[in-house]
């Protein structure tokens, strides 16, 4: 019986551009490592990345309202 060859999906790590196989075993996908994942997270925290759209104002919460949350 011949084995069927499945094409494995490869993507580039968004941080370092290394080829990464997209499989459930890769806990860091789409990143190649925990390090690249944390570098990306730091970029979001520093405001390097943004999501376009309009800013929505939030209702103000008074001190008594906060006691019930």
UniProtKB/Swiss-Prot annotation:
Binds 1 zinc ion. Keywords: Metal-binding, Zinc. Its cofactor is Zn(2+). Zn(2+) binds at residues 13, 16, 32, 36. InterPro entries: DNA_gyrase_inhibitor_YacG, Znf_NHR/GATA. Interacts with GyrB. This is DNA gyrase inhibitor YacG. The gene is yacG.
């Amino acid at each position: 019986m011949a084995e069927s060859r499945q094409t494995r999906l490869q993507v580039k790590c968004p941080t370092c551009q290394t080829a990464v196989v997209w499989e459930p075993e890769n806990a860091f996908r789409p990143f190649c490592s925990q390090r690249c994942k944390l570098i990306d997270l730091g970029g979001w925290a520093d405001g390097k990345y943004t999501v376009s759209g309009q800013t929505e104002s939030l209702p103000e919460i008074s001190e008594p309202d906060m006691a019930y949350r």
